[in-house]
């Protein structure tokens, strides 16, 4: 779900998305308390860079990695012309819609 939501954000905004995640186990400060039973959390890594159409430009694995890649910022302009998601926004209607919840 983590990667899928990032891909959706890239497509909806027509922008690259860079996502970082740690790797390894981080012990809980409560791990020493036998009554709590919290051992900690496992981080799976898989940091990634997505292009403006949600495609993978670079992806790290589950080992500690320095991920370096080039991102073509001009491509966002091209993609936004092909997929003009934001073109059909009705910003002028936002005030009336929000007033229902504010009042």
Feature annotation, model-predicted:
Residues 1-67:
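CN hydrolase (nitrilase-like) catalytic-core segments centered on the catalytic cysteine
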Residues 2-3, 72, 90, 98:
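A structural signal for well-ordered alpha-helical scaffolds and beta->alpha junctions
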Residues 8-13, 40, 71-72, 80, ...:
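Short, surface-exposed linear patches
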Residues 64-82:
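A short, polar/charged loop-to-alpha-helix boundary motif
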Residues 77-103:
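Cysteine/selenocysteine-centered motifs that mediate thiol-based redox chemistry or coordinate metal-sulfur cofactors
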């Amino acid at each position: 779900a983590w990667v899928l939501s990032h891909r959706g954000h890239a497509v909806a905004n027509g922008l690259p998305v860079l996502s970082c995640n740690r790797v390894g186990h981080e012990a809980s400060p409560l791990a020493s308390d036998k009554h709590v039973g919290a051992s900690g959390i496992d981080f799976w890594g898989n940091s990634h860079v997505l292009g403006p159409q949600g495609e993978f430009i670079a992806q790290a694995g589950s080992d500690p990695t320095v991920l370096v890649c080039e991102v073509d910022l001009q491509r966002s302009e091209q993609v936004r012309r092909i997929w003009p998601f934001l073109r059909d926004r009705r910003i002028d209607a936002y005030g009336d819609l929000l007033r229902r919840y504010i009042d």
